[in-house]
Amino acid sequence: MVGYEPLVPTTLPSRLVSIAAYRWKLWKHDGVKTRERTVLITGGTGSFGSTTAQKLLRSESLHEIRILSRDEAKQDDMRRRISDPRVRFYVGDVRDFRSVNEAMRGVDYVFHAAALKQVPSCEFFPQQAIATNVHGSDNVIRAAAENGVESVVCLSTDKAVYPINAMGMSKALMEKLAQAFARNNPGSETVVSCVRYGNVMYSRGSVIPLFIEQLSQGKPLTVTDPGMTRFLMSLTESVSLVEYAFENAQPGDMFVRKAPASTVADLAQGVARVMGVEPDMRVIGSRHAEKLYETLLSVEEVSKAEDLGDYFRVPLDARSLDYGLYTDEGSPGLDQGQDYNSHNTNRLSVDQVADLLMTLPEIQKLVSSRAK
């Protein structure tokens, strides 16, 4: 974001403009001291939480990072790995409002990353997906509002667009909760927004570590569907997306980062190429409720989206529930365009996939160790 100036919205009340300016300063490392802030990351022991925490710890405006998660073993691992007294851990579950509320007291900003994310698991246990991704998200938003939190950024997924699986449906409802809060509470001091992204390479649950393990053991690469496409984003880019939303969001906004895509077959070939292996490939068929391609913005969202260079912003539909408007006046016509999906975005070749993989620290370390 070189040369980028945050879009502090002049249409917001002066109180929210001031909040937006403070949000920007949290991420700046220019020696300018502002009031120290406290950040809560739900589900913070995962890949996103660890990377975000390490970045925030470089800020002059940080007072404390709170990590709320269920797994005390992962918390202990993270505590040893980061070893900074400004990181404080809370064992709790977003499903339990009391534990969320306790962690929320005195917090200025929230990054809501806690979720059930595995598509097959959510298909077999949809009630658990609802409990965490829907009711848990509602607890986070409600506790944030009750404690005067200034900004909440909710992490969503491309599977929330045209959802066909329980995971995507539950995430779509999380987005609706965030938008409904913004629409129904226009005077709230809490700005709730969402970000939506696709596959984060080498994050927990990514297929890339599986491919590496299979190649290391001399096994064939198991590919669900060779023509299946997925968006590809690095962990650093996913954190930058949240940072961008944090700096710029108006109530109810949705932000998406533009991203390239690859077929599953080309991704597998790219992993094999960086490892210097000629792979055998075995097609095993798609898993429960998987799509051939994923969508980051629907046709309807594209028609309203603001193009911000590397990002899209979809503003909140802030109309009131006045039925007369729907029956008498209606809404403006929608553009007859297309959605933004992993089939029509920039498609990477095998060579380009390999080059992209080589930007990941985990792959660089792996290649270096194999060269010794």
Q: How would you label these PLM feature ranges?
A:
Residues 69, 91, 131, 225:
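Conserved residues in the N-terminal Rossmann fold of short-chain dehydrogenase/reductase
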Residues 42, 104-113, 154:
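Rossmann-fold scaffold of SDR-type NAD(P)-dependent oxidoreductases
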Residues 30-37, 146, 176, 180-372:
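Strand-loop microenvironment adjacent to phosphate/nucleotide-handling motifs in alpha/beta enzyme folds
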Residues 88-109:
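Conserved Rossmann-fold cofactor-binding substructure of NAD(P)-dependent oxidoreductases
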Residues 61-74:
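Conserved glycine-rich Rossmann-like NAD(P)H-binding loop of the short-chain dehydrogenase/reductase
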Residues 39-57:
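N-terminal Rossmann NAD(P)H-binding glycine-rich loop of SDR-like oxidoreductase domains
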Residues 112, 116-172, 176, 180:
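Conserved Rossmann-fold NAD(P)-dependent oxidoreductase catalytic core, especially the SDR/UDP-sugar
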